[in-house]
């Protein structure tokens, strides 16, 4: 599917009133679920708060996390104290599944004004709406992604990541700050197999929700690009009906084979950071 209500995502849409209304309402809901209906705790919250509020101008922020439930976003932000989820200008942009969040015009409008970018699962890393996500990074905004690509509620190591987040890092003119976050307990609040394989109609109460913020992941993108280009020279390009566009990153031109090497390297580093943080979260 092409662009969905992109006009509703603009900050000047109807003077910003719909965005302010939706974000304030969703934030109130998230805080109620996280702090009134459940008990929540956040570890290393200041790292995220400082990056959201006072990172260098023009530098984008990407937060990456595991995906435990359909309510991870926005409830995980409701666990933070202060204005993290209440300020419409500072609030995150988030990649959201088109088949869940954009099923009809009403849902589409609400999620669009709430700073959600529709993504077609299985649509590839160069689908049309990924360009909008890239534009948000070019604007220096904060973008949240779930690089696992779907909800996983088992307490197992972080699975192989999809390449969408890696492609955004590589394509961004300014290398984003990438911050890993792990959360636990959300699978109990919104279990996938609650009632004959269905989710509960409302979040379940009296659960302990835990959010653990890591430290920014260090990426030497120019070195990773150089390595990807060198490694790709010894690999036969894959046969595909639709070729990826040529990418220029860190001053080098990458064909599809080189891009695959780069995206694998970036994704593996994010996956490793998330897994390290997941193990830490289990001990806290």
UniProtKB/Swiss-Prot annotation:
Its EC number is 2.3.1.-. It is found in: Cell membrane. GO terms for biological process: glycerophospholipid metabolic process; phospholipid biosynthetic process. Pfam families: Acyltransferase. The keyword Lipid metabolism applies. It is an enzyme of class 2 (transferase). The HXXXXD motif is essential for acyltransferase activity and may constitute the binding site for the phosphate moiety of the glycerol-3-phosphocholine. This is N-acylphosphatidylethanolamine synthase. It comes from Arabidopsis thaliana.
